[in-house]
Swiss-Prot record:
Effect of S30A: 3.3-fold and 2.4-fold increase in ability to inhibit alpha-3-beta-2 and alpha-6/alpha-3-beta-2-beta-3 nAChR, respectively
Official protein name in the record: Alpha-conotoxin PeIA
Modification Cysteine amide occurs at: C37
Main location: secreted
Site (Residue that is not optimum for the most potent inhibition of alpha-3-beta-2 and alpha-6/alpha-3-beta-2-beta-3 and alpha-6/alpha-3-beta-4): S30
Post-translational modification: The hydroxylation at position Pro-27 is critical, since an hydroxylation at this position decreases potency of the toxin to inhibit both alpha-3-beta-2 (1300-fold) and alpha-6/alpha-3-beta-2-beta-3 (130-fold) nAChRs. A non-modified residue at position Pro-34 is critical, since a hydroxylation at this position decreases potency of the toxin to inhibit alpha-3-beta-2 (1-45-fold) and increases potency to inhibit alpha-6/alpha-3-beta-2-beta-3 (1.77-fold) nAChRs.
UniProt keyword list: Acetylcholine receptor inhibiting toxin, Amidation, Calcium channel impairing toxin, Disulfide bond, Ion channel impairing toxin, Neurotoxin, Postsynaptic neurotoxin, Secreted, Toxin
Note: Negative results: shows a very weak or no inhibition on mammalian muscle alpha-1-beta-1-gamma-delta, neuronal alpha-7, and neuronal alpha-4-beta-2 nAChR.
Stated role: Alpha-conotoxins act on postsynaptic membranes, they bind to the nicotinic acetylcholine receptors (nAChR) and thus inhibit them. This synthetic peptide potently and reversibly blocks alpha-9-alpha-10/CHRNA9-CHRNA10 nAChR (IC(50)=6.9-54.9 nM), alpha-3-beta-2/CHRNA3-CHRNB2 (IC(50)=9.7-97.5 nM) and alpha-6/alpha-3-beta-2-beta-3 (CHRNA6/CHRNA3-CHRNB2-CHRNB3) (IC(50)=11.1-17.2 nM). It also inhibits alpha-6/alpha-3-beta-4 (CHRNA6/CHRNA3-CHRNB4) nAChR with a higher potency on human (IC(50)=6.75 nM) than on rat receptors (IC(50)=130-147 nM).
Length: 38
C-alpha cells in the first residue's frame, strides 16, 4: 500500500467534488451533467 497514491487520490476526488458542486450551481452545466447533480 502506497500512502502517497492514497493522498493523491483523495486530492483528486476533492477536486472532482468541488467541480461537481460548481457545475451543479450553473444551470447550463447541471443540464449537461444531470448524473452529477441528481
Amino acid at each position: 500500500f502506497d500512502g502517497r497514491n492514497a493522498a493523491a487520490n483523495d486530492k483528486a476526488s476533492d477536486l472532482v467534488a468541488l467541480t461537481v458542486r460548481g457545475c451543479c450551481s450553473h444551470p447550463a452545466c447541471s443540464v449537461n451533467h444531470p448524473e452529477l447533480c441528481g
